[in-house]
From Swiss-Prot:
Annotated spans, Disordered: 158-184, 296-373
GO biological process: anatomical structure formation involved in morphogenesis; anatomical structure morphogenesis; anterior/posterior axis specification; anterior/posterior pattern specification; cell-cell signaling; cerebellar Purkinje cell differentiation; cerebellar Purkinje cell-granule cell precursor cell signaling; cerebellum development
Keyword Repeat found: yes
Name of the protein described by the UniProt record: LIM/homeobox protein Lhx1
Segments forming domain LIM zinc-binding: 4-54, 63-117
Pfam families: Homeodomain, LIM
Record's subcellular location: Nucleus
Gene this chain is encoded by: lhx1a
Length: 405
């Protein structure tokens, strides 16, 4: 004989119900709260049967306002991690029902003040006010009860402030300003998961963020803010690396002065130099190497073809030892004017311009009479097709006129 699990009497009916692996009379399968018959679906807890509404009202998510259970068919509003009935989500001062998206201020985690009442009472002493944005949810299904506190919409929080910072003396003056919310500590394993997801997709979709929230256990808002900060950091690093590369290229590769030898080919004229000099110049008036007769020490070497090292200065004695460059000019003289004057002398026609006397000691003493005193004597040059007809001789008593043919 089969006995009923509800009334413990034998079942003599033609039909019976099997609930929780036990036999029941049809009339005994009813809600223990409202006593309604359960024909299609029932919920059980601790061996008792409940209808859907009574089960969620008693064991489901509680309203933060009235502390009663929320039915899956009820419309609710959310503020941070709290869920409220529509009728319970009201301002504590004016009892106005707050709508979706309206800015409000939280007092003691479950009491609200609308923005108008808060602004009209800014001299209040409560420093634990939190400014949030209300969010509504049309229904709560049984599958979403466990994730109710973690599932926060992207635009839920407008302005957050840390409740722990309310003990400061200046909180009364900073109530209307923007404050930082509580800081979230991300563990190493969670950080590795987020970095791997960022490497795959720097801008994840909402579906990907939901998966990351389930894997890491973090709030979706925290994940979204982490990705935003990470993208901003990547942009800053790229800008800094590009700027550093430009600075490195500018400071590590300056334009260095190179010698004239590196920039000139053999026989090329020195550009913009004070000496019009040809290495291997040939013409009908000057033979090969004719210009070298001017230098007592022979043609200048390639290592001494800079403007300051050219041994064009005549020697001070019969041995022909050069006096050196123009590194140490005579006090009171102007080397730049001397070089320019020498360039002007050398740039004229050889038959019409006098040449400096090689026997006069001292650098560039034959340049100008107004700088160095009385003008030295000059000698004439007679030119032919094979070169100079004679070398510079000792200074005669007067200047002679040369003939050119």
């Amino acid at each position: 004989m089969v006995h009923c699990a509800g009334c413990e009497r034998p079942i003599l009916d033609r039909f019976l119900l099997n609930v929780l692996d036990r036999a029941w009379h049809i009339k005994c399968v009813q809600c223990c709260e409202c006593k309604c018959n359960l024909t299609e679906k029932c919920f059980s807890r601790e061996g008792k049967l409940y209808c859907k509404n009574d089960f969620f009202r008693r064991f489901g998510t509680k309203c933060a306002g009235c502390a009663q259970g929320i039915s899956p068919n009820d419309l609710v509003r959310r503020a941070r991690s709290k869920v409220f009935h529509l009728n319970c989500f009201t301002c504590m001062m004016c009892n106005k029902q707050l709508s979706t998206g309206e800015e409000l201020y939280i007092i003691d985690e479950n009491k609200f003040v609308c923005k108008d009442d808060y602004l009209s009472n800014t001299n209040g002493k409560d420093s634990n006010l939190l400014s949030v944005t209300a969010c509504s949810d049309p229904s709560l299904s049984p599958d979403s009860q466990d994730q109710l506190q973690d599932d926060v919409k992207d635009a839920e929080i407008a302005n957050l402030s840390d409740k722990e910072t309310g003990n400061n003396e200046n909180d009364d003056q900073n109530l209307g300003g923007k404050r930082r919310g509580p800081r979230t500590t991300i563990k190493a394993k969670q950080l590795e998961t987020l970095k791997a997801a960022f490497a795959a997709t720097p801008k994840p979709t909402r579906h990907i963020r939901e998966q990351l929230a389930q894997e890491t256990g973090l709030n979706m808002r925290v994940i979204q803010v982490w990705f935003q900060n990470r993208r901003s950091k990547e942009r800053r690093m790229k800008q800094l690396s590009a700027l550093g590369a430009r600075r490195h290229a500018f400071f590590r590769s300056p334009r260095r002065m190179r010698t004239l030898v590196d920039r000139l080919e053999p026989g090329e004229l020195i550009p913009n130099g004070p000496f019009s000099y040809y290495g291997d110049y040939q013409s009908e008036y000057y033979g090969p190497g004719g210009n070298y007769d001017f230098f007592p020490q022979g043609p200048p070497s390639s290592q001494a073809q800079t403007p300051v090292d050219l041994p064009f200065v005549p020697s001070s004695g019969p041995t022909g030892t050069p006096l050196g460059g123009m590194d140490h000019p005579i006090p009171g003289h102007h080397p730049s004017s001397e070089v320019q004057r020498f360039s002007d002398i050398m740039s004229h026609h050889p038959g019409d311009s006098p040449s400096p006397e090689p026997g006069i000691p001292g650098p560039l003493h034959s340049m100008s009479s107004d700088v160095f005193g009385p003008s030295p004597s000059f000698t004439s040059l007679s030119l032919n097709g094979s070169g100079y007809s004679n070398h510079l001789s000792h200074p005669p008593s007067e200047m002679n006129e040369g003939t050119v043919w």
